[in-house]
Amino acid sequence: MIKYIYLKMTEKDILGKEKTILPSEEEIQQLFSKSKNLAIQSFSTISDPSKITPLTPEIMSRQATMNIGTIGHVAHGKTTLVRAISGIQTTKHKIEKERNITYYLGYANAKLYKCPKCPDLDAYKAYGSGMEDSPKCETCGEKLELLRHISFVDCPGHDILMATMLNGASVMDAALLLIASNMECPQPQTREHLAAVENMDLENIIIVQNKIDLIKEDAAKENYNQIKAFAKGTKAAKSPIIPISAQYKYNIEAVIYYLCNLPIPKRDFVSPPRFIVIRSFDINKPGTEAENLQGGVVGGTLVRGIIRLGEIVEIKPGIISKNEEGKYIVQNLYSRIVSLKTETNDLLYAVPGGLIGVGLKVDPFLTSKSKLNGRILGHPGKLPDIYASIVVKTHLMSRYVGTKGADKNSSHVGEIKFKEVLLINVGSTSIASEVVDISGENRDVVKFRLSPPACAEIGETVAFSRKLGHSWRLIGWGKVLEGGETI
């Protein structure tokens, strides 16, 4: 029976008694025996992190090294495009299947290849994450060259799920902006999603003009002109506009081509690791015998550093509760990494980029039902402080962009008010936050009380939204200047 001893250990116990236990050579061979068509990883590859890149063959064989977001208005084809490229249906929850829309962040990996013999766009192919590194071209029989291994972060487009979209934006390296050609452009969440990724300093945006199978050529040209006018003056002004039908996989090769030509993100492999948790779950099926229980799993992405199988890690903030006086108290979690996976691919280590599942030796109850969403994982004692409040240099948008008619009769975004409650996105978590102080010459330095507390890094970009009706609407962004009370 698994004993979840790490829950009861203090930081001193972990650092004093528990050490990293790397797997043996025999264990490594056993780990990779199920996927012999992929590269065998070795700790020697990462012994000098300054010499590795996101395109290092041993890394790219098993792990995605870029995160691509799919953004845009509801029902414009984001999930369908991800399925057309990766072969994976990202809507897996019951409510999503019943209503045929995305409610939660969806995830899928894809390997992107080029055939050295096939002409033009026909040379570009996409397969699942478990495909071998040099498969034969189905058209000509030549061996394909692996160019990229990417993870899709499929964001919901419904207006009431804007906070979920912002959580996904925190881990994106680039974005596909889906625009349905059979609707007037822009739609409300087309505007709002583009504004969100711009605020998060995302530079690489590809515009995809979807559903061209539903309209005639003249209508497609008119919609194209609307898209050009909409993108003018934004970070997407020079972005390619790719006409496709995701449903029929028409011109998908063009999307793959542009994905393969995105700039390689600059990664920090040297600093202590910082892993952003965007989901957590219990992988045990109901009725599993106690001796067969597996520990909890967290999923997310590394923004810097490297994590290895067998390492001791800390999760902050861990268990959050309130004392008798109503004040928040936090018990950070410590555990050993017992598995690293990306979809079905086993990993010996994980590097920045791509979505990773980290198996831990903690009670699976703690990770069930997304209980650890928004947490940070890393080496003990190396993570940012937990703050009960933060001070932010704010930048307000001039108007609400996520409401109907915002282009013609847009509502002005009013100034932030004392005691107002806004929704702040810090990393991958959304926090209801009360304004407790406003200062600065332009009244743009705001202190927020976080409820509950969260990890934040000085200089980190945060987004904030205001409640309008039943939905949170994006109103601005800012940089964390300082933390307030630590916990």
Where are these regions (language model features)?
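Conserved Switch II/interswitch segment of TRAFAC-class P-loop GTPases
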Residues: R148-H149, C155-I160, S170-E192, L202-K221
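Long, basic/Gly/Ser/Thr-rich N-terminal segments
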Residues: I2-K36
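Helix-rich terminal scaffold detector
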Residues: S44, I52, R62-G87, R148-V153, ...
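C-terminal effector modules of nucleic-acid-centric enzymes and ribosome-associated factors
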Residues: L31, N67-T70, L214-E217, D363-I487
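P-loop NTPase switch module centered on the Walker A-proximal segment
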Residues: T20, E27, L31-A163, M172
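Conserved catalytic-core segments of large NTP-driven translation/proteostasis enzymes
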Residues: D48-K51, M60, A229-Y400
